[in-house]
Amino acid sequence: MKRLGIVLSLFIALAAHAQAPDESVHQALRQLKTTMSNALNNGDVDTIVANVTPNVVFTTMNDDVCRGPAQIRAYFQKMMTAPGHVVKKLTVSFDADALTILYGGDTGIAYGSSNDHYDLTDGGKFDIRGRWSCTLVREGNRWLIANFHYSANVFNNPILERTRMYLIGAAIAAGIIGLLLGWFLGRRARKA
């Protein structure tokens, strides 16, 4: 019985020891998620590019693909600050669906959803629920993003709904104009 107690104690000690490193890894990854969310919300592109690998691939929600920090910087400039930019302000909130899937001690895959609010330069505003996935790598003692893919539902989103409402309004207006034109031409033909 004493032997069984010793064996069980060893298993418990080994299990506790094995779980401790993963918890510190997941805490570091949570901190990276918070850092990147805050950087996006504050328009801090310097922090964003400081936390990606030199060969990062970023697929944006609007189907652009950026490779490397310089292209990420150029993308944010094009979308948020350059003449003719589209987005005035972006607010995001990322949620992971599960703990990062770890491969060895230096690679992980994370995925989840985001609730995003866009203020556009044309005065438009909309909220959209996004989906994301990313590959993370540890270089030295730092976790960095090596790949980030961001998407939204193409069949159900606020931009599609806005377009649908515009088309319905245009169809109703065209119908009313057609009826009025027909009535006017009909009256004119009767007088002639």
What function would you assign to each model-found segment?
Residues 17-50, 163-170, 178-192:
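Short, low-complexity N-terminal intrinsically disordered segments enriched in polar/charged residues
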